[in-house]
Amino acid sequence: MAGAAAGGRGGGAWGPGRGGAGGLRRGCSPPAPAGSPRAGLQPLRATIPFQLQQPHQRRDGGGRAASVPCSVAPEKSVCRPQPLQVRRTFSLDTILSSYLLGQWPRDADGAFTCCTNDKATQTPLSWQELEGERASSCAHKRSASWGSTDHRKEISKLKQQLQRTKLSRSGKEKERGSPLLGDHAVRGALRASPPSFPSGSPVLRLSPCLHRSLEGLNQELEEVFVKEQGEEELLRILDIPDGHRAPAPPQSGSCDHPLLLLEPGNLASSPSMSLASPQPCGLASHEEHRGAAEELASTPNDKASSPGHPAFLEDGSPSPVLAFAASPRPNHSYIFKREPPEGCEKVRVFEEATSPGPDLAFLTSCPDKNKVHFNPTGSAFCPVNLMKPLFPGMGFIFRNCPSNPGSPLPPASPRPPPRKDPEASKASPLPFEPWQRTPPSEEPVLFQSSLMV
């Protein structure tokens, strides 16, 4: 039996060429010389031959024993082969493929064969028993997930317990009347909301506009962990820094707040304005309207009723003043909330829209025509004398002077009469007109204008 096991192991585990003609030879092989071809067909030294167990022991192990090597103490068999010559296999693929897959080959006849390895790689017997018990008792169950009904029932029970404890705790804390920084209309709405819910309601959810503005808040986490609209929660929501708040989603007609038109009667009669709708629609629009109402309500009445206030025109008729807008609008109907930096002039926005009163004169950029007179001294379209200077030369003036030095100088004419010299007329055959000819003593000056300065 031991020889048959060794022969079958050699033929099935190490390939078709190792067990003697594809595993057909199952008897105990006689000792072969070292040079014979049968010497390479023997199993490796790490495999120790042993006797098979009884058939009833194999049935107790079940189908699990086929994939796990049996750990049996090696016994000295009667038919022990001679000391073998250690040789390596032709390829490691034949060994590693079955080893990595965890599939031990069986005999061709279906007989169960089992091999015991060295003690260094031997599996303890207790492991095999534990594996068998685990396979028989525990079937492969699906891991607990969020979709299982048992898990959902446990979560619903926990949520109901948390809700009851938080409702009782919040009722005691709100009776103490802790102050809340912010809008009191929202606080009153939040105080009235928890008792309105029945005790059996599964989850207290935040309003859709508020929970979208929180970062990292999923709907799954909100369902698991109960979020209550309490004072601490509201303060934590309102303390989100600028730039980290998501924009408010566009809502239907219930959440659309029209811009507040502030009339002088409203400013005088209502010193503290409250919001029309107590439930906040969007966090950004809610703070925006609240800041506009607080700042405009804090304005004193004398300042609001003064004619210099931008809410009024010169004739006393009120102009519609919108609340502090988030962005400027093209119709000049907004007020800047920020003050100008140091060194800059504060400019009123509504100065361009206001019409001047009857006592104020209309200022223009041009000078007044009644006070400024323009007296033209010449024209730009006068003819230009190219060959004659504007004033006669000094030589021409002294030449025309009389011999008496005490007599006054006659007024010099700008255009003297031409001299009739036959030699000069013969010498200059150029076709010049008489007024264009100049005496030889004068020097020509180019591009002289006839404008009188």
UniProtKB/Swiss-Prot annotation:
Signal sequence extent: none
The name this protein goes by in its record:
Protein FAM117A
PANTHER family, A to Z: AGAP011572-PA, PROTEIN FAM117A
Coiled-coil region: 149-175
Keywords, A to Z, come to: Coiled coil, Phosphoprotein
Pfam families referenced in this protein's UniProt entry, alphabetically? FAM117
The residue ranges flagged as biased composition, category Pro residues, are: 406-416
Which residue stretches does the UniProt record annotate as biased composition, category Low complexity? 269-278
Which residues does the record list as Phosphoserine (modified residue)? S29, S67, S178, S193, S201, S213, S319, S327, S413, S428
Please give the residue positions where the record annotates the modification Phosphothreonine.
T299, T354
Could you say which protein family the record assigns here?
Belongs to the FAM117 family.
Is Chaperone included in the keywords of this UniProt record? no
In this chain, the stretch annotated as Disordered covers: 1-45, 159-201, 269-320, 406-453
| Disulfide feature | none
* Species of the source: Homo sapiens (Human)
User: What spans are recorded as compositionally biased (Gly residues)?
Assistant: 1-25
What InterPro entries does this protein map onto? Glcci1/FAM117
